[in-house]
Amino acid sequence: MQAAYRNNYRNTRKGLKYFIAIILLLNYFFISAQTDSVRPGKSIITDSGLLSRQHDTAFLRRQEDLIDIFLKIIRKDPAIRFEKNKSENLHIHFSGAPSPSYSLATGIAFNVTGSFAFYVSEDMKTNISSVLLSPIITAKQQLVVPLQFSIWTKDNKFNIQGDWRFLKYPEDTYGLGGTTTDADAVQLDYDQIRLYTFVLKTLGKNFYAGLGYQYDNHWNIAQLGVPPNTVTDFDKYGFNSSSISSGISADVLLDTRTNSINPEAGSTYANIVFRQNLQALGSDANWSSLLIDARKYFRLSDRSDNILAIWSYNWLTVSGKPPYMDLPSTGWDAYSNTGRGYVQSRFRAKNMIDLETEYRFGIMRNGLLGGVVFANAQTYSETAGNLLKPIIPGWGAGLRIKFNKFSKTNICLDYGFGLHGSNGLFVNLGEVF
């Protein structure tokens, strides 16, 4: 009987070990679906062999991440990761995995992510190029099929970026301006194709400029569940069952970050994009917009690696009348991260200013756990003169779990709050900004 007991104990312990390992992997898959990469520098790859060349080996051996824990659970020595880095082919890497995900706008979702990373040159001086395909199906009957890429030519002379998406995306819209309430919600159903492509030339150290083409096509737009004789803000603005915006853009970028997944103190990011939509290119109307995205990262003390991060995201209509679906809106930045504390599309208007700040601090000395506290303020208006009326605050705190110590990639779990009881969980792989 004692032998049977010991055998059952070993089997139970073994089963528990693999159960914990599976949970850790699912945690990774859960978060990985949140990664979005369309600008230069933000890698979609988190494999140690691709991103470890500039890190101090002795320091990394003292650090711990979820991959180390997983290897220990299956009785593997985490040190094999360092040996792998020495021997593996750094020029081509492919990874793919199914993964559940979650956001306020989609609810529970499921996707299959496939990523391909490669170097176009053998000299190891050229940045890594990447391609990501990640179709998503959600519990709210949404379908998103994004194809995103960032290709660097030899010696980083040019960077070719793309953000191509197909969306079948029922969601709520709340009207225009910053004073709308949850009671104003109207469900929209629509299909969308987005084709954004940019070609940037390196003009100096960390400085790029170039041109792009941006195309947004919405069709099958329908307002659902609207009571008879009710006039929505969409109706007042000018409801159409379809819209096309097609234009050229000028893009200027300064990016001193060496790691855009988890930017280091002292780094700066500034991006300005001017978009001119033209009827001659198939747009429904001539209109233009200006996007100003600026970020700065500060270390407040030489005795600490804690970081104060500040993000200013300004999305302005310069001229003309954009289609309702192309107006600036909460959570419709490239990474769907503005306005934590509010659901995507919660506010919408011709002009949007969003200011965010976040304090990032360590909890465990081995780097496994960290935390953040954050606050943001949005403002929306139909005219530039009323941009500060009203100011819409958001705030919250979050946990950082080190998934990959080589790339400094964190699993980011934030809980945000806003006005009138707005709140929710916000999940990312890599820092929010």
Predicted features and spans:
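Solvent-exposed, glycine/polar-rich loop segments of beta-barrel outer-membrane systems
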Residues: 229-236, 291, 324-338, 385-397
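C-terminal hydrophobic structural anchor segments
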Residues: 360-394
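C-terminal outer-membrane beta-barrel translocator/porin domains of Gram-negative envelope proteins
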Residues: 258-364, 369
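Transmembrane beta-strand segments of outer-membrane beta-barrel domains in Gram-negative
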Residues: 36-77, 81-82, 163-165, 171-302, ...
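Bacterial Sec-dependent N-terminal signal peptides
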Residues: 1-39, 298
